[in-house]
């Protein structure tokens, strides 16, 4: 899968685990809701690490925890 798809799926999973909406995450992280929606809907070819970091802060996790998922295993990602 493409990296943007993995980021999207991971974010969707974290939102579901925490029972948060995109709007709620936007309010907690300071990342615009439209940006979060674009990430979830794979509208970006890539997402800046700074944005992922801000999202992680809103979720209350370290960036390493965000990427600690089978979704980001080398065999799951396209080169």
Regions found by a protein language model. Name each.
Residues 43-57:
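Short, basic-rich loop-to-helix N-cap that marks the start of a DNA-contacting helix
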Residues 12, 23, 53:
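Residues within the helices of the helix-turn-helix
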Residues 11, 25-26, 36-39, 66:
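Conserved hydrophobic/aromatic packing and binding residues within compact polymer-binding modules
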Residues 31-46:
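Recognition helix of helix-turn-helix/homeodomain-like DNA-binding domains
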Residues 1-20:
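A short, Lys/Arg-rich alpha-helix, primarily the initiator
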Residues 15, 26, 56:
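The alpha-helix within a helix-turn-helix
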């Amino acid at each position: 899968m493409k990296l943007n798809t993995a980021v999207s799926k991971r974010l969707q999973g974290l939102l579901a685990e925490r029972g948060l909406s995109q709007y709620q995450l936007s309010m907690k992280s300071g990342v615009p809701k439209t940006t979060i929606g674009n990430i979830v809907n794979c509208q970006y070819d890539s997402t800046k690490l700074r944005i992922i970091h801000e999202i992680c802060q809103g979720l209350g996790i370290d960036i390493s925890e965000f990427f600690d998922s089978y979704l980001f295993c080398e065999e799951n990602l396209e080169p």
